């Protein structure tokens, strides 16, 4: 049986890309009402199918800086006592919803590379003891092997140039039989190689 071909990652400077993404989402965290080329906040969450009962109990600081592209919970609610990793947690809206679903006997780790987003997420968590927010990258998750029952992510995988590396990390932190629930965006046509190198297309 022939092994599957691993796609080649685009030739883009990862550090430059990360800096550009951080700059963009620092602005979303600090100035959520400024207006961006993408939708944000509660209106976006409602468009994406987030239930009012999930949103009503969340801090406004987490909701106002929400910038997801999908709804990972549309793939299924999480179970009590499950362990969850939220990759690219942003201001924490998905992590906090997950924390409510898994209950105090479960655990949620939210990971993001943007410090201002993490500050909002931590503030939003308040005294919840089963939610933790860590600085990190999706390709280098600060999570032990086989820790999670579920990995969730929302609008982040599209920003990672090496998708194979990203999904390999997800597989590493998942328990056997664990699951992935992702909301994201896809292109429906091939992207020329030279276009993949343009930082402004990744962040725009």
Language-model regions, residue ranges each:
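Hydrophobic beta-strand segment of the Class I
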Residues: 84, 151-152
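Class I SAM-dependent methyltransferase SAM/SAH-binding core
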Residues: 69-72, 79-141
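Short conserved loop adjoining the S-adenosyl-L-methionine
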Residues: 140-145, 161
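A short glycine-rich, Lys/Arg-flanked "PGG" loop and its adjoining helix->strand segment in the class I
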Residues: 164-179
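Conserved alpha-helix/loop element of class I SAM-dependent methyltransferases that forms part
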Residues: 38-83, 94-101
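N-terminal auxiliary segments of SAM/dcSAM-dependent transferases
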Residues: 2-48
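Short, glycine-/aromatic-enriched active-site segment of Class I SAM-dependent methyltransferases
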Residues: 185-204
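A short His-aromatic
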Residues: 101, 158-159
């Amino acid at each position: 049986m022939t092994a599957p071909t691993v796609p080649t990652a685009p030739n883009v400077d990862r550090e430059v890309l990360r800096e550009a993404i951080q700059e963009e989402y620092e602005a979303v965290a600090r100035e959520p009402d400024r207006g961006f080329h993408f939708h944000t906040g509660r209106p976006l969450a409602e468009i994406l199918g987030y239930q009012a009962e999930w949103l009503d109990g969340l801090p406004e600081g987490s909701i106002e800086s929400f910038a997801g592209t999908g709804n990972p919970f549309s793939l299924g609610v999480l179970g009590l006592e499950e362990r969850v990793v939220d990759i690219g947690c942003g201001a924490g809206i998905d992590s906090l919803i997950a924390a409510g679903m898994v209950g105090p006997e479960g655990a949620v780790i939210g990971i993001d590379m943007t410090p201002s987003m993490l500050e909002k997420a931590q503030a939003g968590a308040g005294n919840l003891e089963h939610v933790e927010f860590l600085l990190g990258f999706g390709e280098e998750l600060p999570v032990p092997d086989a820790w999670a029952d579920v990995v969730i992510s929302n609008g982040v995988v599209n920003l990672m140039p090496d998708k194979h590396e990203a999904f390999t990390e997800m597989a590493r932190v998942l328990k056997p039989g664990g699951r992935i629930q992702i909301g994201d965006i896809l292109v429906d046509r091939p992207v020329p190689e030279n276009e993949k190198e343009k930082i402004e297309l990744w962040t725009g």
